[in-house]
Amino acid sequence: RESVEDPILNEFLTKAIYEEIIPTLSLSSEELETFAKEVIERFKNPFIKHYLMSISLNSMSKYKTRVLPSVLAYLDKNKQLPERTVFALAAYIVFYRGAYNGEKIETKDNQDILDLYADLWKDFDGSKEAITRLVEGILAYESNWDGDLNTIPNMTKQVTDYVEAILNEGMEATIKAINEVK
């Protein structure tokens, strides 16, 4: 609920739904509007309490099944990657570091995913090269993606740029910058 009450996150979510997800769906305009309103109302519902850790369970497979199809459809239709839904992948990558503001975060996922992230983050030094290696490693994990996402035009660069921005500028500043796109 807090996500739609925060003006920055609300703008991000609204733009993601209306500009990146809805245009990839094959429904009537009435059905699309209903879909958008229902998603936003679900987020606003004070009786539905989702905690970040519950939502984050198995995030990589959720991204693959729920978000990646829209990313690919958007790319096919617009010949460019969507900003917000690709940013979501970068945010997951940073989340799977397992730490925030110096505090440990317990991530929950299939063991192979947790092992992959642990291995890729363990020697991370914060350099642009390290960020690129990290992103390439995640995107190349075919067991999760059923293919190598590095082969998608501009995917590696865009995710790398977002991971770098999150790490160097912070999540909120990065989301604000994305909101200013378009």
Which residues fall in each region the model found?
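Non-transmembrane, aqueous-exposed alpha-helical and coiled segments at domain scale
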Residues: 1-182
